[in-house]
Amino acid sequence: MTLAAPIAVYVLAALAEIAGCFAFWAWLRLGKSPLWLVPGMVSLAVFAWLLTRVDADFAGRAYAAYGGIYVTASLGWLWLTEGQVPTRWDILGGGLCVLGAMVILAGPRAA
């Protein structure tokens, strides 16, 4: 099993989820226009659709593996969009999350 396809989908899903959630953050915390919610909701719908594209027998397993990718993507957002450099603890935690996601994705399954 190749991990490239699900990881690519998870990365795209993470970007869609973070962008959608940030639209709400911008509206509620940064005083942006409520119109920010329109692309935010579209982005969240794209996120949900993308998660259904992962070849997994159970939604919970797909979501659990996604979580590790999401944490790492969030740290990238923190750095690239918000200008806050992740700490070494952020990086260590993100790495552990990705490792956990890889274990979930690549672990053997009963036939």
From Swiss-Prot:
Membrane topology of this protein: Multi-pass membrane protein
Keyword Transmembrane helix: yes
Keywords associated with the record: Cell inner membrane, Cell membrane, Membrane, Transmembrane, Transmembrane helix
Segments traversing the membrane: 7-27, 30-50, 62-82, 91-111
Main location, first listed in the record: membrane
Entry keyword annotation includes Membrane: yes
InterPro entries (UniProt xref): UPF0060 (IPR003844)
Subcellular location: Cell inner membrane
GO cellular component: plasma membrane
PANTHER family: UPF0060 MEMBRANE PROTEIN YNFA (PTHR36116:SF1)
Family under the similarity heading: Belongs to the UPF0060 family.
HAMAP family in alphabetical order: UPF0060
UniProt protein name: UPF0060 membrane protein Pden_1837
Source organism per UniProt: Paracoccus denitrificans (strain Pd 1222)
